[in-house]
């Protein structure tokens, strides 16, 4: 499929029949990350050029914006529905305090980023879940953003690419959270019934409630 021709694979021992990748050239002034698997310190620039995969084959987790930079053509992403935010309908103790703290630490307003972009020159709608925002859990705002994106894609006859990184339903929102699975599934079905393409990318971690 031409839509997927841009995809390339990282170089590592797991993808090359056990052969080791080239030795890491380290610069003392460059920030590094320690691989939890092989315990080596790897320069951030080396990880970035290799899709955040260590030479031993360990995959580092990525934020939504990092994945966006890998997936979308440069300067093609236009964010949608960022004004849809969490509200505390159940008055769950300390919920909004946690949300505000998470917004600061993750630099995102919610657990999903939605918009339009070009991937390999192909226009599409794109959503990426943010693991640093309450483990990418699906609350009412997340469900509403994704539903609106599929409705937008159906109206404009665009394919959708979705990156799921989620710990499941957001317990602080109770039934309002559980309702989102039915709502988003309905929007996905209408998009499919219109004969449009949807590519879900399941990444670590993705639990059954949001697949």
State where each predicted segment sits:
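Extended, hydrophobic alpha-helical segments in both membrane/secreted and soluble proteins
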Residues: 198, 210-211
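Terminal-region recognition feature
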Residues: 1-196, 205
């Amino acid at each position: 499929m031409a839509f997927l021709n841009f995809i390339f694979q990282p170089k590592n021992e797991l993808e090359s029949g056990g052969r080791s990748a080239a030795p890491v050239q380290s610069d003392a002034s460059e920030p590094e990350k320690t691989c939890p698997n092989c315990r080596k310190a790897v320069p951030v620039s080396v990880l970035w050029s290799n899709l955040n995969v260590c030479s031993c084959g360990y995959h580092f987790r990525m934020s939504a914006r990092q994945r966006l930079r890998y997936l979308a053509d440069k300067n093609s992403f236009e964010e949608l529905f960022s004004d849809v935010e969490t509200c505390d309908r159940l008055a769950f103790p300390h919920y909004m305090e946690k949300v505000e703290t998470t917004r600061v630490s993750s630099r995102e307003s919610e657990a999903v980023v939605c918009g339009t972009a070009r991937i390999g020159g192909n226009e599409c709608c794109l959503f990426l879940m943010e693991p640093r925002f309450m483990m990418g859990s699906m609350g009412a705002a997340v469900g509403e953003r994704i539903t609106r994106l599929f409705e937008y894609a159906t109206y404009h006859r665009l394919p959708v690419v979705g990156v799921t990184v989620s710990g499941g339903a957001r317990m602080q929102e109770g039934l309002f959270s559980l309702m989102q699975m039915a709502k988003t599934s309905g929007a996905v079905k209408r998009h499919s019934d219109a004969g449009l393409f949807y590519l879900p990318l399941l990444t670590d971690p993705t639990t059954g409630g949001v697949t």
